[in-house]
Design a protein with these regions (language model features):
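Glycine-rich phosphate/dinucleotide-binding loop and adjoining beta-alpha-beta core of small-molecule
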Residues: 1-81, 91
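Small-residue (G/A/S/T)-rich helix-start motifs and N-terminal tracts that mark the onset
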Residues: 76-120
Length: 120
């Protein structure tokens, strides 16, 4: 799975855009919030990546509430967690608990998330 982008191209073009036809900027617009508008009767778990460790937990809790989620997997990028790394750690946040995983391979974290999700 991949995350849906928060932003999309404001003026998409068909085909390839050549470098010399590109210009010096790309205009973006806000994409539809699929998770917020999902009305299925299932467990809804959001994934949030933050770089601001100070506000990350509050931002994740706001996401949990505002999007009516069952849980949020919070990933904070920093010295030990880099974008594109094979290792990560997450905070699994529900309305009642915050559980922290240890730094591990992403496949192991995915398995842990699956187990945690079964208990909500």
């Amino acid at each position: 799975c991949a995350a849906v982008s928060d932003f999309i191209c404001a003026n998409p073009k068909d085909g390839k855009i050549k470098k010399d036809q590109m210009g010096d900027k790309i205009e973006l617009k806000l994409n539809i919030d699929i998770l917020k508008n999902l009305n299925l009767k299932c467990k809804k778990i959001g994934f949030k990546m933050e770089m601001d460790a100070k506000n990350a937990l509050n931002n994740a809790k706001d996401m949990l509430k505002n999007k009516n989620l069952d849980a949020v997997c919070l990933n904070i990028l920093g010295d030990d967690i880099k974008f594109g790394s094979n290792e990560t750690k997450i905070s699994f946040i529900t309305k009642d608990t915050v559980m922290q995983t240890s730094l591990a391979q992403k496949e192991i974290i995915a398995s842990q998330i699956t187990k945690l999700a079964k208990n909500i």
